A protein has these predicted regions:
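Interfacial segments of alpha-helical transmembrane regions
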Residues: 1-5
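Transmembrane alpha-helices that form the ion-translocation and gating core
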Residues: 6-18
Length: 113
C-alpha cells in the first residue's frame, strides 16, 4: 500500500514544485528513485519488526535497507540527475507516506478488533 501512495505523492509534488534543470523537460523534486527506495526500505524494516524473525537479524535488515537507500541516492547525485535537495525531498516523501500508511493500517486493524 505504501509504495503506490508514495508514487502518487511523488508525482503530485513534482507537478506542484515544478523544478527542472535548464533545457530538460523532466521534473526533479522530489527524487522518485529515492522516494520509492526509502518507502521500500522502510516497509521491509517494518515487516521484519512484526514478523517472526530472530531479533538479532532486525538491525542487520535495517542497516542493509539504509545502505540501499544511500546507494540509490548517491547514484542519482553522482550521475548529476538530482540535487541534494531533490534527494532529501524524495527521502522525506517516502518516509512520511510510509509511516502515515503504517499508522493508518494500524488504526484500522485496532478498530476492527
Amino acid at each position: 500500500m505504501a509504495l503506490p501512495v508514495t508514487l502518487a505523492a511523488e508525482v503530485l509534488l513534482k507537478r506542484v514544485v515544478h523544478r527542472q534543470w535548464e533545457g530538460d523537460p523532466d521534473l526533479l523534486f522530489p527524487s522518485g528513485h529515492v522516494a520509492m527506495a526509502t518507502a521500500a526500505a522502510l516497509v521491509t524494516v517494518l515487516a521484519v519488526r512484526v514478523a517472526p524473525v530472530a531479533p538479532r537479524l532486525r538491525p542487520v535488515v535495517a542497516w542493509l535497507a539504509g545502505g540501499y537507500v544511500c546507494t540509490i541516492a548517491l547514484a542519482r547525485l553522482v550521475e548529476t540527475v538530482h540535487s541534494l535537495t531533490d534527494l532529501l525531498g524524495g527521502a522525506a516523501t517516502g518516509l512520511a507516506v510510509t509511516l502515515g500508511t503504517a499508522l493508518a493500517i494500524t488504526a484500522l486493524v485496532r478498530r476492527g478488533r
